[in-house]
UniProtKB/Swiss-Prot annotation:
Effect of inactivating the gene: Mutants are viable with a 98.4% hatch rate which is close to the wild-type hatch rate. No apparent defects in the central nervous system.
Subunit note: Interacts with pnut.
Keywords: Coiled coil, Cytoplasm, LIM domain, Metal-binding, Zinc
Signal sequence coordinates: none
Sections of the chain in a coiled coil: 216-272
Tissue: Localizes to the neuropil of the embryonic central nervous system (at protein level). Also detected in third instar larval brain (at protein level).
Source organism per UniProt: Drosophila melanogaster (Fruit fly)
Domain of life: Eukaryota
Designated name of the protein: Hillarin
Length: 818
């Protein structure tokens, strides 16, 4: 029997009970509203806790108003409610911050520091050879982005996007299926679900009683044994009072230990049985949802067919010449590779701006039936793609993993729809399938393996550790993958934090990963391997061993349009006998100007070991960029296995130079195996983090190299480096590094001069060997400019200017023979 709890209140607007999951408040005088009733009393505008206002001039008025209709104090009055004017006037001035690559600072790579510098080996970097970029697949387009790449997305206009796939627009479900008929079938399904949950509850209670009775019997037997032993020891001979007390204390301690031991054993057994029962419950729930989804689809298909006998299902009366509108299939087609790629369906998520807005709006309220929920989501959708999209976005916006449920949740409360999520019997994937059936879409849940959290390249799939589930939905004439759970991950780059004048929720609330919506099979297979081969949706399916050996790439790899410049990369890369191995990644042309890469190298079997003989492992990797190729050349300092993690971020020069923190995300990982090492490896000079060579200087600072275009320079005992400035820069500084020599002792060997737009660096090497040269500069930003030799330089009081930022670095081999 249901008992009201303390958290129930009455809605001020409709006087009905407000449940905790649907509650807004307490507000003025401890008033509450339903989220759906929380509207302006005057105009009905939907309000939030940030946008509502109370009447400040009448204490008895408990109602809520929008900013336009809240009673004002009179004409000409300026207060805190006046369209944010005061907030704008009080807004703090923006400041310049130190860029994370400024000398001596650290930047974050997925939460870890980007400390020291690059990598190693004396002879390992003596080659001038850098291979040219390989050609892209001519029929494939790169460079898709989701909402996180706002500086790209906003530059595209929806009207300018042309697609190879055109879908005839269909009439909404309201045209051919009455809401009441669909709701009637839902109520039948809900009764079946209620019966199933009662069965689950009864079974759990029965198992709980069995465990309780079993341990109670054991407790009584053991207690009787201890008591008998205690009484026997007391009766065997005369005992002093102290001895009797000792025996009594020992007996009490034995009882306490027995109780603790049995409580622990009971908890473990209950946990084990509950886990097994939950697996069985998930199976039964999935089977029920599968059958109910089929029944719902049959109803929709039947009514749709009846309607089509007398009316056209399409909204458009005329079609382009030669185009035959494709009707949505009544029965689920067999799995087959899609003929049209995701890029041909849509090129940017901005195309779904309207349906995404619907999903976000619907997610702000709680519906009591799936019929109401799905009708609100797809009521204005005219294609199967839009229907699948709005369901996908609703789930990602809802963020079910973080949702709070009351313990006394009932099936007829708003959040009772999602009780399967609460109890763990229903997953994102089962829910997505259920909602798709209400929208008339064929959908399946696929089981298999995934390279998910905790997976590292080279790991074999031998047990259930990396088991996962995902969906395939039939849209755009083919089966296409959807991974709601991974798409709903709310991870935000630091550079995407709220800006001045924007609310926190504006930038964080609806973050999602568009890669996992309608993912192309040839990209999806890098992370997911189905148990049923046909659900790879590939023309040439691969084996589990081949899946294990695929490079370990993340969604960002595809969102940035990256691809490997050489054929044959596997999850494990083997070095040659000098300990050398190279990973080369190609960038699309339109991304070369904004992509920045970093990396991390550590021992494969240890998260803590980031150094070798006191030297950072990062100094055994040389990262360089030539053209559209970024290369990571590893020289293992010893035999063994290493983990190379490559990160990337897309930034503009303006973003880079402001000094705002940039958090890099992983794009791919490799296991580097060095089976034998015949050469002693020497670490690279301890320079600033980042790539070697002048490419970054040109890309971000407009500094064009005149004399040396490659990251590796062969020089005599002196060297002149020249650059041309394409925009004003000032306060150049160069630092020289060599293993075994303190940096400050090398400072006198580097000078520079500027003449018009030419800057020249002159280096006189004190001895032969390998050197690293760091170059720093800043944009012209104020009337005073001084040379600074540390990164704690602040702007002068008479003018604001950027702090010194790392510009580029070179690796120089100095020898009299050069």
């Amino acid at each position: 029997m249901y008992r009201p709890n303390f958290y129930e209140s009455t809605c001020l607007r409709c006087s009905e009970t407000v449940y905790q999951v649907d509650r807004v408040g307490p507000l003025k005088d401890f008033t509450f509203f339903h989220s759906g009733c929380f509207k302006c009393v005057h105009c009905g505008t939907k309000l939030t806790l940030k946008t509502y206002f109370n009447n400040q001039h009448k204490q008895d008025d408990k109602e809520v108003y929008c900013s336009s209709h809240v009673p004002k104090s009179g004409p000409g009055h300026l207060d805190q409610t006046s369209v944010g004017i005061r907030q704008a006037l009080n807004a703090p001035r923006t400041n310049k911050f130190v860029n994370e690559q400024i000398r001596g600072t650290r930047s974050e790579v997925d939460g870890g520091p980007l400390g020291g510098s690059r990598q190693s080996t004396p002879n390992g970097y003596g080659s001038r050879e850098i291979s040219s970029p390989s050609q892209n697949d001519s029929d494939y387009k790169y460079g898709r982005f989701d909402a996180s790449a706002l500086h790209i997305a906003h530059a595209l206009k929806q009207t300018e996007i042309q697609k190879a796939y055109n879908k005839a627009r269909e009439k909404p479900i309201d045209f051919y299926l009455a809401r009441e008929e669909q709701a009637h079938l839902e109520m039948k399904h809900r009764k079946e679900e209620d019966d199933l949950y009662r069965k689950f509850a009864s079974k759990r209670a029965e198992e709980d009683r069995k465990i309780q009775d079993e341990f109670q019997d054991e407790w009584e037997r053991e207690l009787q044994r201890l008591t008998h032993k205690f009484e026997k020891e007391l009766a065997t001979s005369r005992r002093s009072r102290d001895e009797a007390n000792i025996l009594t204390m020992r007996h009490e301690q034995q009882k306490e230990d027995l109780e603790k031991n049995m409580t622990l054993r009971r908890s473990k057994k209950k946990e084990s049985i509950t886990r097994k029962m939950l697996e069985h419950e998930r199976y039964e729930t999935a089977a029920l949802v599968d059958r109910q989804s089929s029944e719902m689809l049959e109803l929709i298909s039947a009514r749709r067919s009846e309607y089509m006998q007398s009316e056209s299902i399409f909204l458009d009366d005329e079609f382009s010449e030669g185009a035959v509108p494709v009707e949505y299939p009544l029965n689920a087609p067999i799995p087959a590779p899609p003929a049209v790629s995701k890029f041909q369906i849509y090129t940017d998520p901005i195309e779904f701006e309207d349906v995404d807005r619907i999903a976000i709006s619907v997610a702000q309220e709680d519906q009591k039936t799936f019929t109401d929920l799905v009708r609100q989501l797809v009521g204005r959708c005219t294609t199967d793609i839009e229907k699948a999209r709005t369901i996908f976005r609703w789930i990602t916006v809802k963020n079910l993993n973080a949702m709070h449920f009351d313990d006394d949740l009932r099936g007829d409360t708003p959040m009772g729809l999602l009780r399967g999520i609460k109890y763990g019997t229903e997953s994102y994937h089962v829910l997505f399938k259920r909602l798709c059936s209400y929208a008339g879409l064929h959908c399946v849940v696929i089981k298999g393996y995934s390279k998910s959290a905790g997976y590292q390249p080279g790991v074999k799939f031998q047990d259930s550790r990396f088991r996962n589930s995902w969906n395939a939905v039939y849209v755009a004439g083919a089966w296409r993958f959807v991974q709601c759970n991974w798409g709903a991950r709310h991870l935000v780059n630091a550079k995407e934090a709220p800006k001045q004048g924007r609310g926190k929720n504006d930038s964080l609330r609806y973050e999602y990963d568009d890669h996992y919506f309608l993912t192309d099979p040839r990209e999806f297979i890098y992370e997911f391997y189905p148990l049923q081969e046909e659900w790879q949706l590939l023309k040439r399916p691969i084996t589990l061993r081949e899946f294990e050996n695929l490079p370990f790439v993340r969604s960002l790899f595809f969102r940035y349009g990256l691809h490997f410049a050489d054929e044959g990369y596997g999850a494990v890369v083997f070095t040659d006998d000098t300990g050398a191995a190279t990973v080369r990644i190609a960038m699309p042309t339109d991304m070369q100007s904004c992509l920045i890469f970093h990396y991390n190298l550590k021992f494969y079997d240890s998260d803590e070991e980031l150094s070798y003989d006191g030297v950072s492992l990062k100094r055994f990797v040389m990262q360089s960029v030539i053209g559209n190729i970024v290369a990571f050349r590893v020289h293992a300092p010893c035999s063994g296995a290493f983990l190379l993690d490559i990160f990337a971020n897309a930034v503009t020069p303006q973003e880079y130079l402001t000094g705002e923190p940039m958090k890099f995300k992983s794009v791919c990982k490799f296991k580097i195996c060095c089976e034998e090492l015949q050469t002693v490896m020497v670490p690279l000079p301890d320079c600033a983090s980042g790539e070697w060579g002048p490419t970054k200087a040109t890309r971000l600072f407009g500094l064009i190299p005149i004399t040396h275009q490659d990251p590796l320079i062969f020089a005599g005992r002196s060297l002149d480096l020249q650059f041309r400035m394409s925009r004003p820069l000032t306060d150049f500084m160069a630092t020289l590094h060599k293993n075994g020599i303190e940096e400050k002792k090398l400072a006198k060997y580097v000078t520079h001069s500027t003449l018009d737009d030419i800057v020249t660096f002159i280096i006189n090497f004190p001895e032969e060997g390998q050197y690293g040269l760091d170059i720093y500069t800043r944009e012209l930003g104020g009337p005073q400019h001084h040379h600074h030799h540390n990164n704690n330089n602040s702007s002068s009081s008479s003018g604001e200017k950027h702090l010194l930022t790392h510009c580029c670095k070179y690796l120089i081999n100095s020898s009299k023979r050069n």
